[in-house]
C-alpha cells in the first residue's frame, strides 16, 4: 500500500473525519486480486495535534479508528495519538508531510506553509453561521482550497469544525474592540491572525497550544482565543477570569 499522506483540517467546529489511501501500487494490487490474494494488514499512525483525548476531536478520531478497523474486516488498524504525544503541532504536520505520521488533524493555520491560501479561514467573521460555513467548505470554495494540496506532500481528506472561537482573558471583560487595547493574546504562527489582533489593538504572541496554559498561568500572555471545547479540555477557566463570547 502506498504510504498515506493525510490531512484533516479544522475550519471552525468538529466531528467529521474522512480518510483515503494512495494508488501507487495499482498494478500489484490488481495482480494480487486476480490471484485471489488479500492485502496485508496495515497500521496507520494518526494524531489530533494540539487537542486532548477527551475533546470532541479526540473522541471522533477514536471512533474513526474503530470504524476503519470494522469496515476493513480488521485489515486496517489506526494507532491514535493526541495533543503533544508525538511532538508539538507544527512538528506533527511536518512529520506527516515526511511520512513519519500518516494522518494529522489540526487547525488550518498550521498548513499555511504548504497552501498559503488556506489562511482565508483565519479571518474572523468570515461565516455568518454554521450552515454557511458548511455550505462553503462542502462546495466549490472548499474544493478549490483542497485542490491546492495536490502539489504538496500532503493530501487533504476533509474539513471539519470544532465550534466558533471565543476570547478568554485575565484582565477585563471584552465588550468592544477598545477593551482589547494592549491585551497580550496568544495566537498560532499565522500572519493573518497576528494582523487581525493587532487591528483590534491587542498584542499577539505566537505560542504552540501545549505552551498556552503555562503562559496564561505565568501571565506571559493575558488572553487566548479558542473553541469552547478546547477552553474546557485545557481547563483555561483555572487561569482566566473572563470569557467573551465573540463567535469569531
State each model region's role:
Residues 128-148:
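A gly/proline- and charged-residue-enriched helix-loop-helix capping module
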Residues 15-16, 142, 197:
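Residues in and immediately flanking transmembrane alpha helices
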Residues 22-24, 35-131, 150-248:
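N-terminal secretory/targeting leader peptides
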Residues 1-43:
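Short, low-complexity disordered leader/linker segments with a strong preference
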Amino acid at each position: 500500500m502506498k504510504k498515506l499522506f493525510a490531512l484533516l483540517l479544522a475550519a471552525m467546529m468538529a466531528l467529521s473525519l474522512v480518510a483515503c489511501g494512495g494508488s501507487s501500487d495499482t498494478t500489484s494490487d490488481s495482480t494480487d486480486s486476480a490471484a485471489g490474494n488479500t492485502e496485508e494488514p496495515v497500521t496507520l499512525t494518526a494524531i489530533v495535534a494540539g487537542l486532548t483525548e477527551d475533546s470532541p476531536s479526540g473522541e471522533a478520531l477514536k471512533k474513526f479508528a474503530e470504524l476503519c478497523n470494522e469496515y476493513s474486516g480488521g485489515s486496517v488498524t489506526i494507532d491514535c495519538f493526541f495533543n503533544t504525544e508525538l511532538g508539538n503541532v507544527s512538528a506533527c504536520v511536518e512529520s506527516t508531510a515526511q511520512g513519519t505520521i500518516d494522518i494529522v488533524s489540526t487547525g488550518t493555520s498550521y498548513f499555511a506553509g504548504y497552501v498559503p491560501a488556506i489562511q482565508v479561514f483565519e479571518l474572523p467573521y468570515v461565516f455568518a453561521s454554521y450552515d454557511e460555513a458548511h455550505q462553503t467548505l462542502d462546495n466549490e470554495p472548499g474544493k478549490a482550497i483542497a485542490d491546492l494540496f495536490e502539489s504538496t506532500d500532503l493530501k487533504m481528506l476533509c474539513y471539519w469544525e470544532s465550534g466558533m472561537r471565543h476570547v478568554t482573558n485575565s484582565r477585563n471583560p471584552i465588550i468592544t474592540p477598545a477593551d482589547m487595547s494592549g491585551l497580550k493574546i496568544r495566537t498560532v504562527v499565522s500572519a493573518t491572525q497576528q494582523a487581525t489582533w493587532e487591528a483590534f489593538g491587542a498584542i499577539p504572541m505566537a505560542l504552540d497550544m501545549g505552551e498556552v496554559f503555562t503562559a496564561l498561568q505565568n501571565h506571559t500572555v493575558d488572553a487566548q482565543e479558542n473553541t469552547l471545547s478546547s477552553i474546557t479540555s485545557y481547563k483555561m477557566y483555572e487561569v482566566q477570569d473572563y470569557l467573551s463570547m465573540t463567535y469569531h
